Amino acid sequence: MEEFNHQTIDPDLFTISDVICDNACFYRAIANYMYYATPHDNLTKVKRFYSWGNTKSVDKVNEKMGQYSEIQNNLAEFIQRKIVDYVENHKDDILPQTGMSIENSIQLIHELTLDEYLSYYDVFAGDIDINQDLEKEEFYIDRWGSIIEQYVISKIIGCPIIVFNTQRYDTTYNKISNGKIINNKPQKGVRLKLSAVIGEEYIGTKLPIFLIWREYNKNGHYLVIYPNNPSTVLSEINI
């Protein structure tokens, strides 16, 4: 138990905010954080990441963005488009997490060719799209956010992306189990386990994006988390 606490992080360092559980939860979580991490209401300035790190209040972000809003939809669609453009123009970049090019990483992780990826991801993940055809059969492509998309966003904004998952120590069975988050509140005993740090070269230069990834209804789901003290959060989590 002591080792578990030492290797995990108190969730009270953050304010947790869920987004709707659709195919675009990754992009929606990023959209909410973009709005939080800039002081501007003008979406053009938000989309240019002006004054990144001069944060808005979480109350204001939750009021404007919440689980779903038109502003969120706008920003989520924008950031997905930026990712597609970056991938198209940097397909040979080496992804540190795989040691392979972005193109080959797409084949490994998404099981798509580059051309398929560019075509499918050109459709916003939040849009219902059941009319695509493969060998005369309808199918649906899950445009989920993987380490590829995390890496690209880190490059676009020039900031780290730090991803946690939620864990809980089960004292009855003396084992670690998945931790639940209900109504943006962690279940008693739930702590955050560092899962990935993307864009380590940007640590200390720009405010990171903080996310939680967890299983939800047997699928992956992203939540956004806002540091309660942005200026000290990295030292508090020992990064």
Model segments located where?
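Papain-like cysteine protease catalytic cores
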Residues: 2-15, 20-174
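Deubiquitinase catalytic domains
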Residues: 118-239
